[in-house]
A protein has these predicted regions:
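Juxtamembrane/disordered regions of integral membrane proteins
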Residues: 1-134
C-alpha cells in the first residue's frame, strides 16, 4: 500500500470539506467529486502497480475523515449554507453533528467503493509509470 499517495490524494477531501462549507453549493458538488474521482483513479493507476481498488477505497475513507471533521468543526457556517441538509438532519434521533460523525464514515466507504471501481478500471486502461532505473 502506498500510504503517502493515499494521504496526498485525500487532501482533495480536506479541500472539499472546507469548500463545500463556504463556496461549493450542494447542487454542483457531485460534479466536483466526479472530476476528483477521475483524477484520483488516473493517478492511482499511474503511480501504483497493483491493488488499485484498495487504494481508491482507502483514499475515500481518509477523505471522509477530512470532510466530516471540517463539517463538524465548521457546523454553524455549514448549516447557514446547507439549510436543506440541516432540515433533513432535524428528523434524525441524534444531533446534526452526531449524525455527521456517524454517517461520514459510511459515506466514505460507499464513495470508496465507487472510487475503488474507478481506480480498478483505470488500472486496466492506463499504463503504470515505470520505476526509475538505478
Amino acid at each position: 500500500m502506498n500510504w503517502k499517495l493515499i494521504f496526498q490524494l485525500s487532501l482533495f477531501g480536506l479541500f472539499m470539506g472546507i469548500a463545500t462549507v463556504f463556496v461549493i453549493p450542494s447542487k454542483i458538488e457531485p460534479l466536483f467529486w466526479l472530476a476528483i474521482f477521475l483524477l484520483c483513479a488516473y493517478i492511482i493507476a499511474k503511480q501504483v502497480p497493483d491493488k488499485h481498488f484498495v487504494h481508491g477505497l482507502m483514499v475515500s475513507i481518509v477523505n471522509s475523515a477530512w470532510i466530516t471533521t471540517a463539517h463538524i468543526l465548521l457546523f454553524s457556517q455549514y448549516a447557514a449554507n446547507h439549510q436543506q441538509e440541516v432540515e433533513m438532519m432535524k428528523s434524525m434521533p441524534l444531533s446534526p453533528r452526531a449524525m455527521m460523525a456517524l454517517m461520514g464514515p459510511v459515506v466514505g466507504i460507499v464513495s470508496g467503493l465507487v472510487l475503488g471501481i474507478f481506480a480498478f478500471v483505470a488500472g486496466k486502461l492506463v499504463k503504470p509509470r515505470l520505476p526509475a532505473r538505478a
